[in-house]
Amino acid sequence: MRVVVIGSEGFIGQALVARLLRDAPLGERALPASLVTRLDVRMGAASSSPRVRCVEGDIGDRAALARAFEGGVDCVFHLASIPGGSAEQHFALGLRVNLQATIDMLETLRASGHKPQFIFASSIGVYGVPMPSVIDEQTIPAPTLSYGAHKYIGELLVADYGRRGYIDGRSVRVPGIVARPPSEGMYSIFLSNLIRELSAGQNFICPVAANAPSWWMSRPCVVDNLLHATTLPARVVTKQRTFLLPVLRLTISEVVQALAAVHGPEVSGRISYQPDATLQAQFANYPPLHCPYSEFVGFRHDGDAMALVRRALDPA
């Protein structure tokens, strides 16, 4: 399997590439990656693996895309994006990277005739705020940020190009992934900071209330789900090309309790609360989420809070 990872140097992309190089099974035939092409605007550490090819370039540059897809491609993971906070502050940049670059990728693949699997990392940002009292697989997206709008349009494009046979498109709606490195462009970064800083013995000021429920998933778990998306048979994706991932719905206090169980009871004394009105409105009232079809076809969450906090700091 010839694989291209777009956004390979990001938080999820690095873990996905590492898993691919450990021969994670891909597709219905469970084949390993024979070649992994990394594409990002800036390359990280070089790989010694002969199965890795690096293409440094802007994902909105069709020449860079053509180099990445050169020689044929069987599976594309599109992970690159400008996150919510940055996309709100820099509208033109968000539009170019999140939307126009996605169109350019799809058009480049259409022109090439490769017809690969195309795994699109969408987002729960498509639902906007306030959310309905329950989210399920029939809930109609209603994004309230540019980032969510870009992701929803991306889903529709992936489904349409899939319907027309230009690609084998599969979109997964990704929740907040922990524990990301520090970032100024992501509104939900405090969820990652909480786990990372409390695990490291630091004090943490939480910008939402202790009883605020959020949706949680570790990086290894989202990589599991992205890889699983490649294995779904055609009859599954013909019926539905966008999948809502199962999540753990946990309050801040439940996550802190799990951290205390893993790292010691002193963890509970290192957190204080100063709710921020904007973050409280955006992240403090996530409703129950039901996605029985996604679970039926094999997508999974981390299991429980203890597993989440243990896996959250794993490299891949």
Where are each of the predicted segments found?
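NAD(P)H-binding glycine-rich loop region in Rossmannoid oxidoreductase-like domains
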Residues: E56-V97
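Amphipathic terminal alpha-helices
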Residues: P288-E295, R300-A316
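Mid/C-terminal beta-alpha module of Rossmann-like enzyme folds, strongest
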Residues: N225-L279
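Conserved Rossmann-fold NAD(P)-dependent oxidoreductase catalytic core, especially the SDR/UDP-sugar
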Residues: I103-S146
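Active-site Tyr-X1-5-Lys
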Residues: V129, A142-R170, S199
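NAD(P)-dependent short-chain dehydrogenase/reductase
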Residues: A159-S214, R219-D224
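Glycine-rich NAD(P)-binding loop of the Rossmann-fold in SDR/ketoreductase-type enzymes
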Residues: G60, Q89, L93-D104, P141, ...
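N-terminal Rossmann NAD(P)H-binding glycine-rich loop of SDR-like oxidoreductase domains
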Residues: M1-L26
